[in-house]
Amino acid sequence: MLKNILSLMMNKFKKLNFLNIFFFIILFLILSCAEENPVRIIRLAHGLDTSHSVHKAMLKADTILNILSEGKMKIKIYPNQQLGSERECLELLQIGSLDMTKVSGAVLENFAPKLKIFGLPFLFKDKTHLFKVLDGQIGKELLEESEKYWLKGIGFYDSGSRSFYTKNKPIEKPIDLKGLKIRVQESVSAFQMVEQLGASPTPISWGELYTALQQGVVDGAENNPPSFYLSKHYEVCKYYSINEHTSIPDVLIVSTHFWNRLSDKEKEW
């Protein structure tokens, strides 16, 4: 009787052992295949609305990258300041917690001082002049400026020209700005420009600006027409005065922590 029980237990053990080995082999094969064909996800954050042309361009970039990499690399986009303000996103890149971001050159100047040049009013003759600078040697040097801070510039976005918009009166000449509280980006050059024009520069996050205008914290701001429209700031500000005082490009930035992990082929994609 005991012999039969032991024999039965041994047979069950052998069956269980065989099943364990079988499932282990299957699991090993699955993991091996996964390691051979990993999908690298690029985490990209920005502060714009999903209806903005820049966001749509990023979606297109993801489609193209997916084709070029044959599905091995994709972009996961976090719009609308989901991961923080532009400066906060740059700081996430610096510690490797985020892979890519799009920021205004005005904000990036805190990490790349040479970009302050874009804060000078009426610097460019026209768009042709601007693009010649951005696409040439000067633009290349400006993109490299922030690498010592773990931020690698890989390209510019044309963000249009900035003009003043206000709640209660149009800005037809510099004296019209005197005494007004004008929202500016986190930029020394923007702060100084508005101050020199006689207004009170007030740094406010883009995501908080609508409420600040509504509650009278500031009397106006300055930005390009698409941003003015898509943010619905026209609901609060009656006047958009087209003076196009600056043309500050946006910059696409990648964390050097992420960049240095890529192969040469992946960098080409």
Residue ranges and their predicted role:
Residues 1-41:
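Short, low-complexity disordered leader/linker segments with a strong preference
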Residues 33-128, 138, 146-269:
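N-terminal secretory/targeting leader peptides
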